Design a protein with these regions (language model features):
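Acidic, metal-coordinating helix/loop segments flanking the phosphotransfer/catalytic sites
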Residues: 30-48
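Acidic catalytic/metal-coordinating carboxylates
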Residues: 33, 59-62
Length: 109
């Protein structure tokens, strides 16, 4: 499984990458905004996207429909610190939601 991490905070990207790689999951890349995200997919592939709901240049509710149209097989899991976002994320087309406060093992499940 190839995973792409999209988060504007370098420390969050590094922590997620470390947790995933310790479990033998291949992190194909990481990006900090939606422009980088869309550019990355022009030359790369991923099976799963861990997407920060609040990227600085385009929120998840706008970027998920674009990704769904271009990459229908891509699984999208939204990361956010607010539980209220769960309903919005699923309505926008996300496959799942993980709170940034959840234990890392929850992400792996």
């Amino acid at each position: 499984m190839q995973v792409l991490i999209a988060n504007d905070q370098p420390s969050v990207r590094s922590a997620l990458k470390l947790v995933l790689e310790q479990q033998g999951i291949d992190v194909a890349g990481d990006v900090s905004d939606s422009r980088e995200l869309l550019a990355w997919f022009k030359t790369n592939q991923a099976d799963l996207l861990l997407l920060d709901w609040e990227l600085p240049d385009q929120p998840g509710k706008q970027i998920i429909p674009i990704l769904r149209a271009r990459y229908p097989k891509l699984a999208v899991i939204v990361l956010n610190s607010r539980q209220q976002t769960r309903t919005e994320a699923i309505a926008a087309g996300a496959d799942g939601f993980v709170s940034k406060g959840d234990h890392p093992e929850y992400l792996l499940s």
